[in-house]
């Protein structure tokens, strides 16, 4: 049976894991790393780079290197948080065809879902390379506190790669699975997940294979990227104060600042002070300018203190919704790269009154949990029951713009709930069902997920028609809403599943694009392998020609030299052709045969000159027989 993989599609880094026997195992990528940067870059010649290769060239190609795009999923272009990010990232955020925030590279627009598909493809290929077989099914994680229809987002890019998403689970829940799989005694735990782009807090009861989420809360725009941006803003302000130059308008400088900020932030988790040194960051009429600045842990903590404090309110809300106090939490599990920051750990300790658990790798635990859930669905992991919840209340707009809840927040999913409504006016022949999500009392203050009309109602007095509205949420958090007129049996429904602004035609195009890139990648890899073989052969042929060229005729030397030159030209081409390189490699090997024969004869002659005359053919046979007999005798005597 083909393996089902677990993928943590993160804002900053992504990770893929699989069940290996009874244990979940993180799969290393082609670069030998256990996590892959969630970055995609496009070079001037159209080549696409994903992961570490994209990160390595970011400084020289800042406008076409895309990172943290997951933060834009489901965001409108006019969103205040998007507006702020637009001025702090080196690439361009544009308005998509559907009004959502998209990104641009080399003059072409991409939806966040398309970029996610490219990263997913990298994770899929990583797993296939390790397993040695095609991967067709996966469990993918999403932030627990997505405040709209975004839990469905991973399905679309995954489908474009031929990857069936068996289950979408929340990141803290996945982390709890990895943490508590071997825990038999009952525990109440809090999973504090501060990742690259989002913050989640979940309260769970675990024990004897049952993982029940009691509540979840969070902030969809709070993560490591915000900490980096805060430090970038500080560096920009300091440089402007000292030099009078605003680096915000310099894309290359911004990319260098972003990398330096991330590096400094990481270093200050283990040291008290670091130095940021960026020579030639910019230049003016007086010459080049350099940025050199000492940064202490205390200064960093003062810059980001309000960001850390923003995690407290969601934690308190989650505790209240779960009906427990901080003292009743047995263990606090830290997840996400930002949880390594000492200030974050200090705040968690103060809030929950205990040292947080640091026994899991915060970068890998979510992918491991996804792999365990994949194992559950595949039947490899027995006696595990996962009960997740919906993070926000769901309902419809009723008379006067009131938000009427059908499903309360933190309801265990899957779930189904129905309620009967009626018309507000006499002879009303249609009703509009507006589906919203949130905790405000008025529908306009909540997030509108979608709407649809139930039409052709028979004329009747107000309050007479019986319209049954049903909310159905599956285990993936995907919402389906239906409205049925009990009198006529007429029914309409809507599936709340964000598509990232892509039509079916767009999705089909993405499938073809993915296939096209797979072919291009294969060709590029073949060309590199052929070039490596060619360069090795050229080197050995040139050395042999130099050392033993006098052993062959002038015509043979010329033929070998010409073949070497032809192979060099083919392998050094700007767009090398693997077939052409292979053909010219074969030609060089063939014309070099006489040279190889001459080398062999020369070596044999040298061997004879050293006082060991080459034995006759007959002698060889006798020697072999003699040695065999002697060996047998040794065996007998033994």
From Swiss-Prot:
Role, per record: Acts as a chaperone.
Region (Disordered): 514-542, 605-638
Family: Belongs to the heat shock protein 70 family.
Induction profile: By stress conditions e.g. heat shock.
Bias-annotated ranges (Basic and acidic residues): 514-529
CDD domains in alphabetical order: ASKHA_NBD_HSP70_HSPA9
HAMAP family reported in the protein's UniProt record: DnaK
Protein name per UniProt: Chaperone protein DnaK
Keyword tags: ATP-binding, Chaperone, Nucleotide-binding, Phosphoprotein, Stress response
Organism: Rhizobium leguminosarum
GO MF term (any one): ATP binding
